[in-house]
Design a protein with these regions (language model features):
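Generic alpha-helix structural propensity
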Residues: 48, 52-56, 87, 114, ...
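Short, mixed-charge, low-aromatic patches
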Residues: 8-17, 77-82, 142-148, 177-181
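Long amphipathic N-terminal alpha/beta scaffold segment
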Residues: 59-99, 103
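Single conserved hydrophobic/aromatic residue that forms the stacking wall/gate
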Residues: 183-194
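Glycine-enriched loop-and-adjacent helix/strand subsegments that border the catalytic/binding cleft
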Residues: 99-100, 104-185
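Non-catalytic accessory regions outside enzyme or core folds
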Residues: 1-76
C-alpha cells in the first residue's frame, strides 16, 4: 500500500465509523486529506478499533513522522557550562529521545478539538489511536481526573520517542493583572524563589 492509499483507507474507515461524518467530501489534495485525517483522529472517542486499522495507521504514521523529520537527541550538543544540559527549540513530536512531556488536561485523553494547535493534540495525532485508548484504560482504572502536577507514563507508540510523560499543568483560576508581575523577575528561577 502506498502512503496515499493508507491515508485514504484511514479516512474512509473513520468516516464510515461516524455516520454524521459519512457525508463528508474527501479533499483531493494531499494537505486537505492530511487535515481531514487529523481532524477525524482528534474527535474520535476512545473505543475499540480494528487491528487492521491500527496496522495501516501505524505504517502511515511511521512514514509520516519520517517525512516530517526526526531529530535524534544524540546529534545535539550540550551547553558549554553543563554537559548534562541541552537546549533545543523545535517540535517535540519529532524528537528521538527517551521521553517527552505532554502538557494535557485533567481527563488525560488528548485534545478533542479538530486541528487545535496545542501540544496535546499534536502528540495524540502523531502517536496514533493507541495512545488515547491507553490513556482511557489508565484513567478508567484510576477512577478520577488527574490532579495538577501528577503524571502518567506511556509508550511513545508511533512517535520517535520511547515514552511520553503526561502531566496536568497549573490552571490560572483568576484574572491575570499587573499585580501578578510582582511575582516575576528577569530570571524565572529568582521569581519562583521570591514567592
Amino acid at each position: 500500500m502506498t502512503q496515499d492509499e493508507r491515508r485514504e483507507y484511514l479516512i474512509q474507515y473513520l468516516l464510515k465509523e461516524e455516520i454524521p461524518f459519512g457525508r463528508q467530501n474527501i479533499p483531493t489534495d494531499k494537505q486537505g486529506q492530511e487535515n481531514l485525517l487529523r481532524s477525524l483522529m482528534n474527535v474520535r472517542p476512545p473505543r475499540p478499533i480494528s487491528n487492521d486499522f491500527l496496522k495501516i495507521q501505524d505504517e502511515y504514521l511511521t512514514e509520516r513522522n519520517i517525512e516530517r523529520g526526526i531529530t535524534d537527541v544524540d546529534t545535539l550538543a550540550p551547553v558549554k557550562s553543563d554537559s548534562r544540559l541541552y537546549i533545543w527549540q523545535g517540535d517535540i513530536t519529532t524528537l528521538k529521545c527517551d521521553a517527552i512531556v505532554n502538557a494535557c488536561n485533567s481527563q488525560m485523553l488528548g485534545c478533542f478539538s479538530p486541528m487545535h494547535a496545542c501540544i496535546d493534540n499534536f502528540i495524540h495525532t502523531y502517536a496514533g489511536m493507541e495512545l488515547r485508548l491507553k490513556m482511557h484504560e489508565i484513567m478508567t482504572k484510576q477512577g478520577h481526573e488527574e490532579e495538577t502536577g501528577k503524571a502518567k507514563i506511556t509508550s511513545g507508540y508511533n512517535l520517535p520517542t520511547k515514552y511520553i510523560l503526561h502531566t496536568v499543568g497549573p490552571i490560572i483560576q483568576w484574572k491575570v493583572t499587573k499585580d501578578c508581575l510582582l511575582y516575576t523577575s528577569p530570571s524565572p528561577r529568582d521569581g519562583l524563589l521570591s514567592r
